[in-house]
Amino acid sequence: MPPTKLAHVVFQTNHRKAMQDWYCEVLGGHVIYENPRLSFVTYDDEHHRVAFLDYGPLTPRPRAEGGGMAVAATDHPGVHHVAFTFGSMGELLDNYLRLKARGILPFRSINHGPTTSMYYADPDRNRIELQIDNFASAAEGQAWMHSPAFDQNPIGVEFDPDELVRKFQAGVPVAELVIRD
């Protein structure tokens, strides 16, 4: 029997307070509980969605080479990224603009086909994906994943978030904005 939902993500970190503050800012969340070694953050009615443990010194992850991205190297085992879904294009872009005003920028923005996604690096250089679903139903998204377009390019095409904001604010329909070339 499958689970009913993904309940939470827990990060072990040397930077509990910085991580807690970053996730509160990025996800629009708030702290439910904290002490010097442990924090619980939520952004909805759940008791916690993200937690942070600081049990003592950890060896930092190596930086990826090239591209100037301050993200963890991808040739090490472990979690690649964690994704959070917004309810609409407007919500995703409002959050992008809010974070941009605070100096938090995505290191990569991709229309995957099933999702429109922006990737950020947290203070420990974990990758966090903020996304919207591009299809009205999961079944439509899954069907598109069996298309020749997805088979030829399963990763997607990069986009400029500022250009997407400009088009959205100009009134281009969301249905057109999420079409992957």
For each feature predicted by the language model, list its residue ranges.
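Conserved short beta-strand elements that form part of the metal-binding/catalytic scaffold
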Residues: H30-H76, A121, R127-F135
